[in-house]
A protein has these predicted regions:
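Residue-level marker for isolated small/hydroxyl-bearing positions within beta-strands
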Residues: 12-14, 71, 111, 153, ...
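Terminal intrinsically disordered, low-complexity extensions flanking WD-repeat/beta-propeller proteins
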Residues: 212-386
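Short C-terminal beta-strands that terminate individual repeats in beta-propeller domains
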Residues: 30-33, 47-50, 88-93, 128-133, ...
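Short coil/turn segments within WD40 beta-propeller repeats
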Residues: 16-18, 74-78, 98, 114-118, ...
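Hydrophobic beta-strand positions that form the internal "hydrophobic ladder"
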Residues: 10, 68, 108, 150, ...
Length: 386
């Protein structure tokens, strides 16, 4: 499930439809995704599956609001014009995407679950260009605002900085995380700095061009122990042997406050908590990260966005918007009173949506066949002795 905001437009999606709702005048446009285009032969038993079970995993407006793309778990990537809703391209990806982003020039970069990153043009409908590959599943991808570098993360704790688009030239590695890295973003008030977080309970500031860690902040003590115990139980339910001491970060959102400070908001998998921090300072000045508040909503945030000092949160219960005022997020009653139509729409879409639990793929299953081998050996030796 995904949504995005630009101006007064809110794009909301479920399995097969995107609805763009204008919160000022209440206008709605519903777009049904086109059929999947593929040259590969699909077996009949899988064909029905593809058309009946496909969920939109990402819908995003470009930075200038000219375009938006829709990406689904059936490897479909569609690009539209925002104003007239025209379909510009309908592509089939090589593999399912794990993260999709616009570049500053409105091209699209896709990181997939096999560890590859592709670049797709917004002006041409040709096939994507393979940029680079990891040996592990990619979890996030970022093309810097100056379009000089592409930064990628994976499930094996690595952050790789490469030249863009000639990504065979590796600039540096940012090594410091001890678990998978789910989110990377440029610091809004100082684009030479990278902010990262994931499954190890810290978020780190980097001088990414040289792979140097500038500051690391631990947020483990902000998570209630009962929430961690509940999460560990869910890991066991998925037959994962791992036990964690911190919740993995689901979303990291940043927004500039002024020329020397930015807001940071984190949400977590299977938890209703949002943590808010202020990052102040620059590379030339000393960085400082200050805890601001914890926001507890009624359910796990399915998606959240920072847009013009407003925090938009979507949960199973609908949308809620907070405004940053006097160093705290408080409910934005001016916008929330306009969301009744949007929330009614969400209730309809929610009933048709396919629920997905994505966090289990972040943790690796451990297979121990040594004990089984020893038991077989013991039995074999016993038979020989007899």
């Amino acid at each position: 499930m995904s949504f995005c905001v630009y101006g007064t437009d809110v794009a909301l999606c479920n399995n097969e439809h995107v609805v763009i709702h204008n919160i000022e005048n209440g206008a709605e446009n519903t777009i049904r995704l086109p059929d999947l285009q593929t040259e590969k032969k699909i077996d009949s038993h899988n064909n029905a599956n593809i058309e009946s079970f496909h969920a939109i995993t990402n819908v995003t407006f470009s930075n200038d609001g000219k375009y938006f793309f829709v990406c689904t778990n059936r490897k479909q990537l569609c690009l539209y014009e925002r104003k007239n809703r025209n379909l510009l391209s309908n592509r089939t990806l090589a593999r399912a995407a794990s993260k999709v982003q616009f570049t500053r020039s409105n091209d699209i970069v896709v990181a997939d679950k096999a560890g590859d990153a592709y670049l797709f043009s917004s002006s041409r409908s040709d096939r994507g260009i393979l940029l680079l590959g990891h040996l592990s599943m990619m979890l996030d991808v970022l093309v810097t605002e100056n379009e000089k570098y592409i930064i990628t993360t994976d499930r094996d704790e690595k952050i790789r900085v490469s030249m863009f688009p000639n990504s065979y030239n590796i600039v540096s590695y940012c090594l410091g995380h001890t678990k998978f890295v789910t989110n990377i973003l440029e610091l809004p008030h100082d684009k030479t700095v990278l902010v990262s977080c994931g499954g190890d309970g810290v978020f780190i500031l980097w001088d990414y061009e040289i792979g140097k860690e500038l500051l690391s902040v631990d947020f483990c003590n902000k998570i209630p122990k009962r929430d961690i115990e509940k999460f560990n139980q869910q890991l066991q339910d998925y037959h994962l042997d791992e036990s964690v001491e911190i919740l993995p970060v689901k979303h990291l959102r940043l927004s500039a406050l002024d020329g020397t400070s930015s807001l940071a908001v984190m949400s977590f998998y299977n938890n209703s908590l949002l943590l808010v921090y202020i990052i102040s300072g620059t590379v030339k000045l000393q960085f400082e990260i200050t805890y601001v508040q914890s926001i507890v909503i009624d359910d796990e945030p399915l998606e959240c966005h920072l847009y013009k000092d407003n925090l938009w949160v979507l949960s199973e219960l609908g949308f809620k918007v907070y405004e940053f005022k006097e160093n705290n997020f408080i409910p934005n009653d001016k916008i929330n009173c306009k969301l009744s139509q949007l929330n009614n729409l969400w209730k309809t879409l929610r009933n048709d949506s396919i629920k997905q639990n994505l966090f289990p793929i972040l943790y690796k299953r451990k297979y121990d066949n040594v004990q089984e081998y020893l038991e077989r050996k013991k039995t074999r030796l016993a038979n020989i002795t007899e």
